[in-house]
Amino acid sequence: MEEEDEEARALLAGGPDEADRGAPAAPGALPALCDPSRLAHRLLVLLLMCFLGFGSYFCYDNPAALQTQVKRDMQVNTTKFMLLYAWYSWPNVVLCFFGGFLIDRVFGIRWGTIIFSCFVCIGQVVFALGGIFNAFWLMEFGRFVFGIGGESLAVAQNTYAVSWFKGKELNLVFGLQLSMARIGSTVNMNLMGWLYSKIEALLGSAGHTTLGITLMIGGITCILSLICALALAYLDQRAERILHKEQGKTGEVIKLTDVKDFSLPLWLIFIICVCYYVAVFPFIGLGKVFFTEKFGFSSQAASAINSVVYVISAPMSPVFGLLVDKTGKNIIWVLCAVAATLVSHMMLAFTMWNPWIAMCLLGLSYSLLACALWPMVAFVVPEHQLGTAYGFMQSIQNLGLAIISIIAGMILDSRGYLFLEVFFIACVSLSLLSVVLLYLVNRAQGGNLNYSARQREEIKFSHTE
């Protein structure tokens, strides 16, 4: 205890205000990197936060990066292959409601993050063992366990961000976290196929053992994320002791009875969300073989094209977030994003144009939609219902992804890629119709969702007077 008190006194003696004014630090004061009230220390924490979710996002799309190898080595059709994505989504139909509750009331942010990181690690290891032992059911079970940790770990990551950066660069932090997530997905898409070929050359043959070893090596990223979770827990506990700050909480209040009070605009936002994302993530999950078969690309080139959505999303998400913040007009931006996605899918389905064009357009529209759609929930729901609204939105998104992943696999097995693309076009068209309906309903109700940034500022100012 005496050492802890000395550390706290040393840090407080050389506080950030003195350092910012250029005053000399008190004797015995620790370096800025060790002081939880200083920017340098917060940047260290930010680095750990970004890598906290890296393993989860890297391994989520392992099946997409190894689609050909998984189907060949495990001798499964596309329908069974897509179950690897469906099993990830099923637990999150329920857990989206309770992830925040578990972090706030049961585990706490530190233990919650460690536990969810362990689920991610164990799930990936079981997934890899399924390949090594040629047991596809074990791979499915591994993806289920992986899913239990994956989405809840993202909630924990956001909770840490708010705890450390609220009022201090928070929007930038969220943008950087999203960018790191997309980098993880991109690295996976371009690395795993190459890694498989190297292990195949080393072992002298392809097969389920080669697949399992490749997935096990990919799981090292999950161990890296677990190490970050442990380091964050230590630093957060240390900061709480030194600065007497409270442990971070999600602030979510989930009341399922609030669902009956949801307005028509909110239900339309839910429909837009589900119909849009089911035409993006399952497509990426199946995209590699599509680019190989239709356009004649090599496996490596097909992986690069398939990952371009994430490549573009990494730098553009913060840019589009700033753009929407500065301009407002959320519905118009959502309309542009959904329309551009529809054009992208139509180009891929009905033309032989270079798919880089369509995929770059899809990457831009995907980034724009996330920045414009999700904040709209806060404009149509009272603050005390936000946790329920976002939980419900994520829940039905995961339900949609689970069901559509299976349907997409069945369509591809029975009808081929053209029919699958027509199916995705139908989903995006339904999303576009919902955006138009949202615009009309919102206009009839006063138009608050489509206010400009200036109008929102004026209304906010008038309410404070």
UniProtKB/Swiss-Prot annotation:
CDD domains: MFS_MFSD1 (cd17340). Homodimer. Interacts with lysosomal protein GLMP (via lumenal domain); the interaction starts while both proteins are still in the endoplasmic reticulum and is required for stabilization of MFSD1 in lysosomes but has no direct effect on its targeting to lysosomes or transporter activity. It comes from Homo sapiens (Human). Keywords: Lysosome, Membrane, Transmembrane, Transmembrane helix, Transport. The chain crosses the membrane at residues 39-59, 83-103, 113-133, 135-155, 170-191, 213-233, 266-286, 303-323, 331-351, 361-381, 392-412, 418-438. GO terms for molecular function: dipeptide uniporter activity; protein homodimerization activity. One of its GO terms (cellular component) is lysosomal membrane. Belongs to the major facilitator superfamily. Gene3D superfamilies: MFS general substrate transporter like domains. InterPro entries: MFS, MFS_dom, MFS_trans_sf, MFSD1. The keyword Nucleotide-binding does not apply. This is Lysosomal dipeptide transporter MFSD1. Lysosomal dipeptide uniporter that selectively exports lysine, arginine or histidine-containing dipeptides with a net positive charge from the lysosome lumen into the cytosol. Could play a role in a specific type of protein O-glycosylation indirectly regulating macrophages migration and tissue invasion. Also essential for liver homeostasis. Coiled coil: none annotated. The keyword Glycosyltransferase does not apply.
